[in-house]
Design a protein with these regions (language model features):
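Conserved S-adenosyl-L-methionine
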Residues: 132-136
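Glyoxalase I/VOC metalloenzyme domain signal
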Residues: 3-67, 75-131, 147-199
Length: 199
């Protein structure tokens, strides 16, 4: 199922057989038809050389496919949800740091704990990647961010023990718009920018 964000960003829902992630249950959609999550992410890059070093040495990825135009890496145990596809586009004009409506700001990767997150931060800095943030408390999780050689921003995040249930009970998740603590002062402004959802 191909569709577009109102701003023109293209998306596709694709059915696959090899996704063994457990779906959400308890909703109106049958579990076997539920979306399991993101299968892969795609990143455009002008030059593969520096990104290859970052992915393999810095981010711990494994290159599993390369046809010269598209390079696929897997992180962690690989498989659905752990795939990153890089499209090599040497003639593409460099991007801008201005993020427009509908654009993806960064890609998040879960790490197991704060120790692992700190090790990754110090490892990246030791390799010379200086654009690594300090830990940011996002209310539901703690994050660090790094600007990769491709220009894409990656996030390494550690979920808080209670995750999204830190500010609402599990049986009420998704019924109200919840705002992370650091953004609550801007809630009215943020809500005004959201489009209206029809039942």
């Amino acid at each position: 199922l191909d569709f577009q964000h109102p701003c023109g960003v293209e998306y596709a829902l694709v059915a696959i057989d090899e996704d063994d992630r457990k779906p959400h249950t308890g909703g109106p959609v049958a579990p076997e038809l539920m979306i399991r999550g993101t299968y892969s992410i795609g990143v455009s890059m002008r030059d593969a050389e520096f990104m290859e070093e970052f992915m393999q040495v810095g981010w711990g990825g494994t290159r599993v496919a390369d046809d010269g135009k598209l390079i696929r890496y897997e992180v962690g145990e690989g498989g659905a949800g752990a795939i990153i596809d890089f499209e090599v586009e040497p003639d593409r004009k460099p991007g801008t740091w201005i993020v427009g409506e509908g654009a993806i700001h960064h890609m998040a990767f879960q790490v197991d704990n704060h120790e692992q997150q700190n090790e990754l931060k110090f490892h990246l800095e030791g390799l010379g990647y200086t654009d690594v943030s300090d830990v940011k408390d996002r209310g539901y999780f703690d994050s660090i961010y790094v600007r990769t050689p491709s220009g894409a921003m990656f996030e390494a995040t550690v979920s808080h023990d209670d995750g999204f249930t830190c500010d609402e009970p599990a049986d009420k998740l998704g019924l109200e718009v919840m705002i992370a603590p650091q953004l609550k002062v801007s809630k009215e402004e943020l809500m005004a920018q959201l489009g209206y959802l029809k039942d």
